[in-house]
Amino acid sequence: MRQFLLFILFALLPFTAIAQCRYTNTWQDFLNDNWKTEEGRVELVPSAKEDCLAMDVEADKKKTAKMLRKTACVIEWGGSLYLNLRPFNTFGDVFVQAWRIGGDKVLFARQDVAPSRFSIANGDTGIPLSRSSFRSLSKLENLVCYLAAWDPQREELRIARVTAAIVAKFLAGHPAQLSQYQQLERGQREQADIVITTLQAAGVI
């Protein structure tokens, strides 16, 4: 049932009618709900068939699409949020679906990488997406989740890998979902499909 719901969720994304698109250029604007809009058609489309989450911007005006790819921090389209991964220089130059969590954080799924590769606009060229990388991105069960949040001390957006312990903290007020989650095999608890559907069932995202 879980896999079916996820399939429906992502399979319908490309066929969503031309929906209202709005965006923020900074994380603070996102937290303060200060959105901007552009005239004309602006929508998100699948970036690569081998990547189940990656999305790219399409617009009537090429300069609008180029601007959004470069400067937009978060885009809201079709009732969903999409985080721009470009600034991280780690996960590829794409937008991915994201979920707001804990008020000031965003959850998203991507390939599992070492924390040492978490670079934010520091000159790192990131991880090249090879064919094998694309194969690992084709299914949610091959991905893990991350949290993006603003670091006021460094004044930059930072990310952290979502571990089973972090998921358990988010489920602290939801004993039924927490109990079901803790009964899963340890190897499954950090899979993106498990994390996302568990948090959705608890109403956390």
Listing of model-derived features with the role each one plays in the protein:
Residues 9-17, 35, 48, 57, ...:
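Generic low-complexity, intrinsically disordered sequence content enriched
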Residues 7, 68-69, 193, 205:
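Generic hydrophobic-segment detector
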Residues 165-205:
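C-terminal partner/receptor-binding element of secreted or periplasmic proteins
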